[in-house]
């Protein structure tokens, strides 16, 4: 998910998405430990998306807005 797409979501949607991604990350790590993970790059993608969501939530909390045209 791109940062631009994330910024279009409301805070409630972001919190729900964050919860879903954390659950997915847990499942991916479990699959990795048991040797059943097909795509290990998915872990990286999920972690980065979680970081993007947390960053955008924090920006909104602080009132920071980044306009890039």
From Swiss-Prot:
GO terms for cellular component: cytosolic large ribosomal subunit. The keyword Manganese does not apply. GO terms for biological process: translation. GO terms for molecular function: structural constituent of ribosome. Keywords: Ribonucleoprotein, Ribosomal protein. It holds the Pfam family Ribosomal_L29. InterPro entries: Ribosomal_protein_uL29, Ribosomal_uL29, Ribosomal_uL29_CS, Ribosomal_uL29_sf. Belongs to the universal ribosomal protein uL29 family. This is Large ribosomal subunit protein uL29. It comes from Thermoanaerobacter pseudethanolicus (strain ATCC 33223 / 39E) (Clostridium thermohydrosulfuricum). The gene is rpmC.
């Amino acid at each position: 998910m791109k940062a631009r797409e994330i910024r279009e979501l409301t805070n409630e949607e972001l919190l729900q998405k964050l919860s879903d991604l954390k659950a997915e990350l847990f499942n991916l790590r479990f699959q990795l430990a048991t040797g059943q993970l097909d795509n290990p790059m998915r872990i990286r993608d999920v972690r980065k998306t979680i970081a993007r969501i947390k960053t955008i939530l924090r920006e909104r909390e602080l009132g920071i807005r980044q306009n890039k045209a």
